[in-house]
Swiss-Prot record:
Broad class of enzyme this protein falls into: transferase
Pfam families the UniProt entry points to: Leu_Phe_trans
Subcellular location per the Swiss-Prot or TrEMBL entry: Cytoplasm
This protein's name: Leucyl/phenylalanyl-tRNA--protein transferase
Similarity-based family: Belongs to the L/F-transferase family.
Originating organism: Prosthecochloris aestuarii (strain DSM 271 / SK 413)
Amino acid sequence: MLNVRDVLRAYLHGYFPMGDPDDGNVYWCRPRRRAVFPLDTYRASRVVRRLVRDNVFDIQINRDFNAVIAHCAKPRRHESETWISDEIVAVYLELHSLGLAHSVECYADGELAGGLYGIALGGAFFGESMFFRQPNASKVAFDALVRQLKLQRFDLLDAQIMNPHLEFLGAVEIDHEEYMRQLAMALEKKISFL
C-alpha cells in the first residue's frame, strides 16, 4: 500500500511512483535519463507571454488542488487509461494537506481551465502532471510555476520522463548521476514553495 513516508523517501532517492492501469499496481520508477527544466534558461513562448501579459487567465496557487489532481487523473484524449491511480491520488491529497504537494491553476471566467501539480522538497520541485480544458492553459500554469520557483530560488524542476510536450516547453534530459548530483544540492536548501 502506497503511503506518504515511502513516497517522500522515494523522491529523496531519485524514484517516483507510477500506477500501471493494466494490473492496478503502483511501481517505483527511476529512469536512466531524467527530464528536467533548467530554470535559469527557461523562456516562455511568445503565445504564453502574450496570454500572461493580457491576463487571459487568473492564475492561482493551491486554490483547488483536489480538482487539479482529479483532472490530471482522467485519461488523455485518445487514451483509455491513466497512470494516476486512486491510490496515488489519495497519497498526493495527503501530501497536499501536509503542505508538500502544490497546484498551479488557471481560471477563465471563474472556471478551472488548466493546471498542474507536484511536490516541493527543499529546493526541488517534482512536477507530476498537468492538464488543460482550454488551449494553452497548462502552458500558462507551467510558466507561473517557473516564475514561482525562480522567486523562491529553487534549483531543480524535475519533469521525470521526457515527452514531446515537455521538450517543447524546454525540458532537457540528463543522466542519472547528474540528476542525483543536482537533486542532492537542491535538497540541501531550506526554502518554501510559497
